[in-house]
Curated annotation (Swiss-Prot):
Gene Ontology CC terms: extracellular space
The Phosphagen kinase C-terminal domain, residue ranges: 14-244
Protein name in the entry: Protein-arginine kinase
UniProt binding sites for ATP: 17-21, 81, 115, 166-170, 197-202
Record's signal peptide: none
Superkingdom as given in the UniProt entry: Bacteria
HAMAP family on file: Prot_Arg_kinase
Coiled-coil segments: none
CDD domains: bacterial_phosphagen_kinase (cd07930)
EC number: 2.7.14.1
Amino acid sequence: MKNWLNSDLKDNDIVITTRIRLARNIKGIPFPDKLSDDEGRDVVKKIKDTLIVSNDGKENFTCIDLWKNDNNCNAEYLEKHLISKKLIENYNRSAFILNKDETISVMVNEEDHLRLQAITAGLNLEEAYECIDRIDDKIEENLDYAFDEKIGYLTACPTNIGTGMRASVMIHLPALSMNNEMPRILNALSQIGITIRGLWGEGSKAIGSLYQISNQITLGMSENDIISNLKTVVEQIINQENLSREQLMKKYKYELEDKIARSLGILKNSVILDSNECLNLISNVRMGVEIGIINDISKKSLNNLLVNTQRATLQEIYNKELSKKEENIKRALYVRENLR
């Protein structure tokens, strides 16, 4: 699988990432929120040892214990979409196991004992599932999962019971956002068991016209059915977005080109940039790349700007704790230097 930060997608590919997560628990052990820190760390060791044995050296895995890191370091992993907010909340007893390419992440003691994640570039639901399913099978050969023959995998939250699978894509929908079509789409999808969230998942706003679209239903459907349904929905949304872009170009060609050019100009010349403004400007430039107005900027560079302009990553890049004002100044500096 391709790392989404290091991959240049096709110009017309508006799906940025595909992610598959599987929720699993070990039979006979209380859910993570019921464990003491010492008990949780015992689970971490158990899963780490199991993954190393089951992996048989095929993947170069590293185990990262969150309790050994500072808050900024853990936040960096969140900004790269390698871990969740819940894993950070449980930092005293949580960890994650990461492969060299940063396409596979096994979170330990999040809401469940295991959250196995595959994340890759573009719309690649089948590839991501095959990859994480293979690792899941290997782990299950050595660990006794909490499983019920009638309903499937048992999870801390009832909404994950069954397959325990969440399939999601991160997609760029600027034209539908500009045309105020997103409320209608959100309402329609909620009626068929699909949910739309912002860039950072549950509870987050859709900044920069970036949305996460995922399945809500995990019970009574097979993994392949979930993937097939989500893929069909995403392809329909892609078609709607492309149609909206065509309409905008026909009706407001010069206004759209001006908006994109001004956004690029601000990014290349600003001295202070807050996070939300930066994401919105990057969105406009990304649209310019996607529709062929801008030809000298890669999607790969824009993907890296998405992550590297976030607070924790900026502090790591400049090796210092930043005040809010300093953060906005350094963000503008970083963008200027990387869009030359």
